């Protein structure tokens, strides 16, 4: 089998909220989609403690995309991992995470997301969308910062 083609984006910022506030905001997918414009309609979120699954539609450059199912694992409250369980063509998988580390200035948040394609479709999507993902993930983290700091208690 050929090696997959992976396209990633990463963003980081400091948010003046607790790690718990940050990660619980991400897990409230209906709210988080205000920061992550790649999330379309949320079909469901099932959570059992620190694990669960979410199914949501996608959006690429504002255009609707088929739904994906992601499993998640929360390591309270330092890390949140997402893994693709059922992905629409041409995706073969997805891996993403958020890490949170407390600092004197606030919570240092790092978000990385990687879309996994086949070799040929990946090359095409890198040309078409790779630039956008590299810009969108850092912008997503900044949108999250603005939303969370505006709603601070």
Please tell me what each predicted stretch does.
Residues 53-54:
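Short, charged, surface-exposed hinge/linker loops at domain edges
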Residues 17, 91-92, 119-120:
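Residues that form or flank phosphate/diphosphate-binding pockets in enzymes
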Residues 14-16, 82-84, 111-113, 134, ...:
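Residue-level detection of beta-strand scaffold positions
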Residues 116-153:
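A conserved amphipathic terminal alpha-helix motif
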Residues 10, 109-110:
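Hydrophobic residues on conserved beta-strands that form the core of alpha/beta folds
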Residues 1-50:
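Hydrophobic ligand-binding cavity/cleft-lining segments
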Residues 4, 33-37, 43-44, 48, ...:
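Hydrophobic-ligand binding "helix-grip"
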């Amino acid at each position: 089998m050929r090696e997959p083609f992976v396209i990633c984006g990463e963003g980081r910022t400091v948010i003046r909220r607790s790690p718990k506030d940050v990660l619980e905001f991400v897990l409230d997918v209906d709210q988080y989609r205000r920061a992550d414009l790649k999330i379309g309609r949320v079909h469901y979120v099932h959570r059992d403690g620190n694990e669960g699954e979410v199914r949501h539609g996608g959006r690429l450059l504002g255009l609707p995309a088929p739904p994906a199912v992601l499993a998640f694992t929360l390591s309270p409250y330092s890390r949140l991992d997402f893994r693709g369980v059922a992905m629409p063509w041409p995706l073969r998988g997805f891996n993403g995470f958020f890490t949170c580390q407390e600092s004197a200035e606030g919570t240092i948040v790092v978000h990385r997301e990687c879309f996994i394609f086949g070799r040929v479709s990946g090359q095409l999507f890198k040309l078409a969308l790779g630039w956008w993902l590299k810009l969108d993930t850092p912008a997503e983290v900044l949108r999250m910062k603005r939303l969370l700091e505006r709603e601070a208690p």
